[in-house]
Amino acid sequence: VSRAKIGTQEVNALAAADALMALAGHRRQQVWEASAIKPAPALLKSVPTRERPLFLPDTPEGENILFDYKATGLTLRRHPLALLRERLATRGLLSSEQLNALPDGQDVSGCGIVTLRQQPQTAKGTIFVTIEDETGPVNVIVWKSLRETQRAEVLHARLLAVHGTWQRSEENGTAKGYGAVRNLVARRLEDLTPLLGRLGTSSRDFH
């Protein structure tokens, strides 16, 4: 790091993003050692330090995922909903994988992090929302009437539970599961964002 002449601010940002693992180990250790870096006067740069190193315990997985999103907006670790799956299952909320195995017309409930909101000009007030969990995305259709009664959930929820009807149609001439159109048509929405704790996520919104 010193050879590359990287500034203190950049070193701290790299440590927060868990990018210095090869130099300092796990993230908590990286952040600790990065915070200890202070510019030294030219005369003292060659003077060795005699401080005994302090070794910190590793960060729990959930906290690491939280810091990943805070530092970079994404994570290469497990999806946040993998950590919440048991709690979501007790609420009767199915995963994307489970939904995709269901037949057309079934009443279902699913949940995911909102990654996209679209409101095309030709949709007459309908909003298309994409939610995502650890097994994949789910396309959600929110009709204008529901949007008007649950506007806060539609526009502001980061973790959204959707209760509605599973819509699935197979294209002619395609193998089952291929070329299928799958949507969850919302009947009721539930904002479960508090379950994410301090996790910062954002969606791409298009109008």
Predicted regions and their residues:
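Hydrophobic, well-ordered secondary-structure elements that form the walls
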Residues: 72, 112, 131, 157, ...
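Short, surface-exposed secondary-structure edge patches
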Residues: 99, 105-106, 149-154
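Short glycine/proline-enriched turns and hinge-like loops at secondary-structure junctions
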Residues: 106, 121-126, 153, 177-178
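Structural detector for short beta-strands of small beta-barrel domains
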Residues: 107-121
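Hydrophobic core residues within well-ordered beta-strands of beta-rich domains
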Residues: 108-110, 127, 160
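OB-fold (S1/OB) nucleic-acid-binding surfaces
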Residues: 120-145
